[in-house]
Amino acid sequence: MQVKTQSCVVAGKKTVAVTEQTIDWNNNGTLVQITRGGICGSDLHYYQEGKVGNFMIKAPMVLGHEVIGKVIHSDSSELHEGQTVAINPSKPCGHCKYCIEHNENQCTDMRFFGSAMYFPHVDGGFTRYKMVETSQCVPYPAKADEKVMAFAEPLAVAIHAAHQAGELQGKRVFISGVGPIGCLIVSAVKTLGAAEIVCADVSPRSLSLGKEMGADVLVNPQNDDMDHWKAEKGYFDVSFEVSGHPSSVNTCLEVTRARGVMVQVGMGGAMAEFPMMTLIGKEISLRGSFRFTSEFNTAVSWLANGVINPLPLLSAEYPFTDLEEALRFAGDKTQAAKVQLVF
């Protein structure tokens, strides 16, 4: 059976369009009608620069990996027509050594929605109808707010970062960079028992959102003195670096106490002068955090059950046919945190 769909496609720098496509449904997997999707930083990079890092757009590609929808057809008796689902954008191979160890985010042959890492590119979820693996569909109650449920993927990233830090109950936590992911980390660590949460950012608007999401103290490093948090080899048990900026990396290392944990979430470039002696001398455990594994299901559960409320981060919603306008607004960080497309 052939299904016609309308898709949000990027073909290069500042070159996007909503185009009609045809997909073949052969009763394998699950056919989903996409209802809503959040615009991520990678979508913006593909639009603004025609690439993410070294991954350049070489052919038209459907954007988007933060999507939810309703089941149209499925090869599984566990999914029924009309079932509301969040779609996990990860499609690991299932048989490499990392998949076998249940570290699927490290899969050596990962296919991730809306990624130009491979060629042919992997189409994303910004399309009216999408055929996916049944295992990628995570059901949630129909009564749940779809604006909330569309935060499942970024919340999964935040929960995974929180898990990378280890035990958080009673810990003092510092978060540098409170864009959407940083703000969701605030909520995640608070849910997991952090006793004190301090957020740092140079944007007053971002700091205000961090406060709404559960931060106790707000700091602007350009204006506020942080020496008292750096004294005696640092104050915080755990720090999260979420901006990727070198000065933020340095600050996190300075305010993290000896034998504390720093989780690197922000994606930045190489640092010419990384403070190696601070890391070594204070015996800080530096841990990377990349995407998620089982945390996607956790995120769906948290959102469906009202464990956290991400809606303060929702700045605007657009019909998917206004794709370029939505991308332009989402790229204006003086106004936008999270922008969603409605299908």
Curated annotation (Swiss-Prot):
SUPFAM superfamilies: GroES-like, NAD(P)-binding Rossmann-fold domains. It is an enzyme of class 1 (oxidoreductase). Zn(2+) 1 binds at C40, H65, E153. Binds 2 Zn(2+) ions per subunit. Pfam families: ADH_N (PF08240), ADH_zinc_N (PF00107). It catalyses: L-idonate + NADP(+) = 5-dehydro-D-gluconate + NADPH + H(+); L-idonate + NAD(+) = 5-dehydro-D-gluconate + NADH + H(+). The keyword Zinc applies. GO terms for biological process: D-gluconate metabolic process; L-idonate catabolic process. Its EC number is 1.1.1.264. Zn(2+) 2 binds at C93, C96, C99, C107. Keywords: Gluconate utilization, Metal-binding, NADP, Oxidoreductase, Zinc. Pathway: Carbohydrate acid metabolism; L-idonate degradation. Gene3D superfamilies: Medium-chain alcohol dehydrogenases, catalytic domain, NAD(P)-binding Rossmann-like Domain. GO terms for molecular function: L-idonate 5-dehydrogenase (NAD+) activity; L-idonate 5-dehydrogenase [NAD(P)+] activity; metal ion binding. Its cofactor is Zn(2+). Transmembrane segments: none annotated. Catalyzes the NADH/NADPH-dependent oxidation of L-idonate to 5-ketogluconate (5KG). Belongs to the zinc-containing alcohol dehydrogenase family. This is L-idonate 5-dehydrogenase (NAD(P)(+)). It comes from Escherichia coli (strain K12). The lineage of its organism: Bacteria, Pseudomonadati, Pseudomonadota, Gammaproteobacteria, Enterobacterales.
